[in-house]
Amino acid sequence: MKASFCVIASCLVVFALKGTAEDTGTEDDFDYGNTGCPFPVLGNYKSNMTKPVGCKNKCGSGYEVLNDTTPCYVIDQKVFNNMVPLRQYSKCPLGFCENGECKPNDQAEDCYKGREEQK
């Protein structure tokens, strides 16, 4: 009797949690409020760190700009969009943000694009 009560109670909890899940729609429809919009990023398997692609990102009706000296990848948005997720690319050019642009610093490292949900 106690076991069946626990199973029923567990099912009700799961049902209640699923019922409260909210679909936020597409990224374009989501209101990020004061936190800004997500930047496209690339990762590095050796350091397990991500860096933004470029330093300026369209956000709503304007643009969000990263702080100067932020490390970044000097990769065009079109190139980023065509990258295959989880494939390692060699010699991804590195730079630092300066006035909304990723300025090359003559260094490069291997990089990869995350899965689509990790944009």
Swiss-Prot record:
Disulfide bonds join C37-C59, C55-C97, C72-C102, C92-C111. It holds the Pfam family EVA_Class_A. It is found in: Secreted. GO terms for molecular function: C-C chemokine binding. GO terms for cellular component: extracellular region. Coiled coil: none annotated. Salivary chemokine-binding protein which binds to host chemokines CCL2, CCL3 and CCL8. InterPro entries: EVA_Class_A. Its main location: secreted. This is Evasin P983. Glycans are attached at N48, N67. It comes from Amblyomma cajennense (Cayenne tick). Residues 1-21 form the signal peptide. Keywords: Disulfide bond, Glycoprotein, Secreted, Signal.
